[in-house]
């Protein structure tokens, strides 16, 4: 240290300021130029004080030495270059600020002029016909008016492009010229999801350009019906791809406006229509059974119980019993309505309220029953793939969808147990499957995905199935029951032949500990003209999850209901 002090005193110091530079460990940002907190560069030292005295510790050196003449010249040159660069940057920044100010002033003047433009519907134009976007192709080169929500909007070189949505489709709308001039003021505070009425002529797009429907509306007049908020409250700030699933469920009323969610709901609507058309073709009659009941179908553990004028009642688990009652009156019957299950499991395949597509068939045996289920599924899919509305949506949602090949694979429960064990697909407890196991969802799906084709899983043990299922004549420990399994989703249909003998049904009540009194009307179906009959139920949301390649059935209904979720 004494040697360093001697060097300092021996130098011809121009300033009282002395800075220390450590090329290895110094820091221009956090250092203060002292020996204990040195700078990194001589340039920074000179920028701090141009007349300072500088000592430098080179890489690998243990001592601070006076800066060499060449190093000092180089540092001073670096300071000069940095100063020029900084001055040039400041000049450029000032010029940019001046241009921005001029542009802002010009834009303010333009907007003020736009504000004073009075836009009127063209007097010499034909009357605009109100249409839905889905009908746009039929009105090309015609003047129309279209109401809708602003799905997206952008401005480019004096043109405003709007993608308008009305629930039936999307339409590109173009505002230019005088219409743009006025709209450029009116639309400043027009956020996504604003509602507007746009007037103009629908023009087919030239080759090389694209838009929904391959046409666009050239707007000549508009009306703003309601301006949705911008800024922090803008619709686009309410939803984002990284949002938690629970938040998206809270915002489901907004989520369904998105292209994917609305596409699923449109396919759902077309699927319901296709199913009804298929039922009509199969000569089945639609009925509407009650949703408030005093009987159970699938066991008491999943019943929603409520007080019905002082009596215990339940939300229906299934309309099966009522469909059976309708057989002698109407023949083959079906219903499409909600069923309710107090499911405790939070899986992606379960809902507490779901749309249940059920049908019952008289005078059939088990083989015929399976054939009709297969026919119903395949005919419904064929109708959807021929539907001009559903087909493009299905291709958009599930590009790799292939309609199921027929016949569906028949796989008995006992053979399924063998398959699971042979392929080392274990129970949730990590054990091999055995007869009597209720095959878990994960194992069932893994097997189905490996086989990769529709499966009729048949002949389940009596002990794991419902009381009303018919036993196999020569194997009374088995039932004439079936689950239809689809790759990537698992079970979508469950059904069985029903007990047709009154004594067998009474024995089933006793075996399951069920009081037969509330079921008197169901029992009497076996008293007055019984017959072999079967029926099944299809979960619409599971069917859609398979068809539209959705991860969870919660995406396949308007507002899903499941454990702890009953809003919005």
Curated annotation (Swiss-Prot):
Which stretches are annotated as coiled coil?
none
The biological processes this protein is annotated with in GO are:
asparaginyl-tRNA aminoacylation; cytoplasmic translation
Provide a GO CC annotation, any one: cytosol
Q: Which GO terms describe its molecular function?
A: asparagine-tRNA ligase activity; ATP binding; nucleic acid binding
PROSITE patterns to which the protein is assigned, alphabetical:
AA_TRNA_LIGASE_II
Q: What family does the Swiss-Prot or TrEMBL record give for this protein?
A: Belongs to the class-II aminoacyl-tRNA synthetase family.
Q: What is its EC number?
A: 6.1.1.22
Catalysed reaction per UniProt? tRNA(Asn) + L-asparagine + ATP = L-asparaginyl-tRNA(Asn) + AMP + diphosphate + H(+)
Q: Where in the cell is it found?
A: Cytoplasm
Keyword annotations from UniProtKB, A to Z: Aminoacyl-tRNA synthetase, ATP-binding, Cytoplasm, Ligase, Nucleotide-binding, Protein biosynthesis
Q: What does this protein do?
A: Cytosolic asparaginyl-tRNA synthetase which catalyzes the specific attachment of asparagine to its cognate tRNA.
Q: Which organism is it from?
A: Schizosaccharomyces pombe (strain 972 / ATCC 24843) (Fission yeast)
Q: What is this protein called?
A: Probable asparagine--tRNA ligase, cytoplasmic
Q: Which InterPro entries match?
A: Aa-tRNA-synt_II, aa-tRNA-synth_II, aa-tRNA-synth_II/BPL/LPL, Asn-tRNA-ligase, AsnRS_N, Asp/Asn-tRNA-synth_IIb, NA-bd_OB-fold, NA-bd_OB_tRNA
Q: Which Pfam families match?
A: AsnRS_N, tRNA-synt_2, tRNA_anti-codon
Principal localisation = cytoplasm
């Amino acid at each position: 240290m004494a040697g360093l002090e001697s060097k300092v005193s021996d130098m011809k110091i121009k300033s009282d300021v002395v800075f220390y530079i450590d090329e290895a460990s110094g820091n221009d940002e956090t250092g203060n130029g002292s020996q204990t907190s040195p700078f990194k560069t001589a340039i920074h030292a000179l920028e701090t004080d141009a007349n300072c005295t500088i000592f430098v510790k080179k890489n690998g050196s243990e001592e601070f030495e006076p800066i060499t003449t060449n190093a000092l010249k180089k540092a001073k040159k670096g300071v000069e270059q940095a100063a020029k660069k900084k001055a040039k940057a400041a000049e450029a920044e000032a010029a940019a600020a001046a241009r921005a100010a001029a542009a802002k002033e010009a834009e303010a003047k333009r907007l003020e002029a736009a504000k004073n433009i009075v836009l009127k519907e063209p007097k010499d134009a034909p009357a605009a016909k109100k249409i839905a976007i889905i009908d746009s192709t039929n009105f090309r080169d015609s003047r129309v008016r279209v109401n809708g929500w602003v799905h997206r909007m952008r401005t480019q070189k004096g043109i405003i492009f709007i993608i308008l949505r009305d629930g039936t489709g999307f339409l590109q709308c173009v505002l230019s010229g005088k219409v743009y001039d006025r709209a450029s003021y009116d639309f400043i505070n027009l956020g996504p999801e604003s509602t507007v009425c746009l007037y103009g002529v629908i023009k087919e797009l030239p080759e090389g350009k694209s838009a929904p429907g391959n046409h666009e509306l050239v707007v000549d007049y508009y009306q703003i019906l309601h301006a949705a908020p911008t800024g922090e409250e803008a619709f686009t700030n309410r939803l984002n791809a990284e949002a938690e699933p629970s938040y998206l469920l809270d915002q489901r009323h907004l989520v369904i406006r998105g292209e994917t969610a609305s596409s699923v709901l449109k396919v759902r609507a077309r699927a319901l229509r296709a199913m009804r058309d298929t039922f009509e073709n199969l000569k089945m009659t639609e009925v509407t059974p009650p949703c408030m009941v005093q009987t159970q179908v699938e066991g008491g553990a999943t019943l929603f119980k409520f007080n019905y004028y002082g009596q215990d009642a339940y939300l229906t688990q299934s309309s099966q019993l009522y469909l059976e009652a309708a057989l002698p009156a109407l023949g083959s019957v079906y219903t499409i309505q909600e069923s309710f299950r107090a499911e405790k499991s939070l899986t992606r395949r379960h809902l507490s309220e779901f749309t249940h597509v059920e049908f019952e068939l008289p005078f059939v045996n088990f083989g015929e029953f399976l054939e009709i289920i297969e026919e119903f599924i395949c005919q419904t899919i064929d109708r959807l793939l021929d539907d001009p509305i559903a087909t493009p949506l299905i291709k958009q949602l599930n590009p790799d969808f292939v309609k199921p090949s027929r016949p569906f694979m028949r796989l008995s429960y006992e053979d399924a147990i063998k398959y699971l064990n042979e392929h080392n697909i274990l129970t949730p407890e990590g054990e091999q499957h055995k007869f009597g196991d209720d095959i878990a969802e994960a194992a069932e799906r893994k097997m189905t995905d490996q086989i990769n084709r529709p499966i009729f899983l048949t002949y389940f043990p009596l002990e794991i199935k419902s009381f009303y299922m018919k036993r196999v004549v020569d194997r009374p420990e088995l039932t004439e029951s079936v689950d239809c399994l689809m790759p990537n989703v698992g079970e979508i249909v469950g059904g069985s032949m029903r007990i047709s003998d009154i004594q067998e049904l009474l024995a089933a009540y006793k075996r399951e500990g069920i009081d037969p009194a509330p079921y008197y009307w169901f029992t009497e179906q076996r008293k007055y003209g019984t017959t072999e009959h079967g029926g099944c139920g299809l979960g619409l949301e599971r069917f859609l999850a398979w068809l539209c390649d959705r991860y969870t059935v919660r995406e396949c209904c308007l507002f899903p209901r499941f454990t702890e979720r009953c809003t919005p």
